[in-house]
Amino acid sequence: MTLVTQKAPNFIAPAILKNGKIMNNFDLKKYSNGQITVLFFWPMDFTFVCPSEIIEFNKTFEAFEKRNVKIVGVSIDSVFVHQAWQNTFPENGGIGKIKFPMVSDIKHEIQKSYHIEHPELNIALRASFLIDENWIIRHQVVNDLPFGRNIDEMIRMIDALNFHNKYGEVCPVNWKHGQEGMKASQEGVSSYLKKYFS
């Protein structure tokens, strides 16, 4: 089920913050505070593909921060398991210190509200949601468990959202930051296709 164009479900749940402290009533909407937010889910801590994704989000954190974008991650593990995972070095299967909140969905309520629960295993699929300033989901991608997500694609989508908001133009195939957009009109598409596809 796609949630694109719909209001993002809010939640209040325990989380471990970037300073390592545990917050029992982390409020997603309050934390986002009107900023674009990337909300992503992973199946479980101390597994296989998951640490590579979280470490990559952490490595590219500044790229999100300079775009004024918040990152929040969620899994069904407790905050104490999140904490133990952060306290484990990557060479031992851990993730080290993380610069964004890691939420505990121990009751599975959050993954159900976003409709990304695995039908048999009752864990989250690898889902990412781009939530805009008006709390609308503008982009969603869901991968099956064996396949890691593309962090660069999320950054590209943030750039596309910002471009559209600023100029009112749409972003054609393979659009990247710095490239020309397309006016959403018959004249606009004709001009663009003539320039790039003729």
Curated annotation (Swiss-Prot):
Catalysed conversion reaction: a hydroperoxide + NADH + H(+) = an alcohol + NAD(+) + H2O
Subunit note: Homodimer; disulfide-linked, upon oxidation. 5 homodimers assemble to form a ring-like decamer.
Keywords: Antioxidant, Cytoplasm, Disulfide bond, Oxidoreductase, Peroxidase, Redox-active center
Protein name (database record): Alkyl hydroperoxide reductase C
Gene Ontology cellular-component terms listed: cytosol
InterPro entries, per database record: AhpC/TSA (IPR000866), Peroxiredoxin (IPR050217), Peroxiredoxin_AhpC-typ (IPR024706), Peroxiredoxin_C (IPR019479), Thioredoxin-like_sf (IPR036249), Thioredoxin_domain (IPR013766)
Family annotation (Pfam families): 1-cysPrx_C, AhpC-TSA
Note: The active site is a conserved redox-active cysteine residue, the peroxidatic cysteine (C(P)), which makes the nucleophilic attack on the peroxide substrate. The peroxide oxidizes the C(P)-SH to cysteine sulfenic acid (C(P)-SOH), which then reacts with another cysteine residue, the resolving cysteine (C(R)), to form a disulfide bridge. The disulfide is subsequently reduced by an appropriate electron donor to complete the catalytic cycle. In this typical 2-Cys peroxiredoxin, C(R) is provided by the other dimeric subunit to form an intersubunit disulfide.
Function as written in the Swiss-Prot or TrEMBL entry: Thiol-specific peroxidase that catalyzes the reduction of hydrogen peroxide and organic hydroperoxides to water and alcohols, respectively. Plays a role in cell protection against oxidative stress by detoxifying peroxides.
Active-site residues, record numbering mapped to chain: 50
Family, similarity comment: Belongs to the peroxiredoxin family. AhpC/Prx1 subfamily.
Gene Ontology molecular functions: NADH-dependent peroxiredoxin activity; thioredoxin peroxidase activity
CDD domains documented for this protein: PRX_Typ2cys
Domain Thioredoxin residues, every copy: 2-163
The enzyme's E.C. designation: 1.11.1.26
An annotated GO BP: cell redox homeostasis
Subcellular location field: Cytoplasm
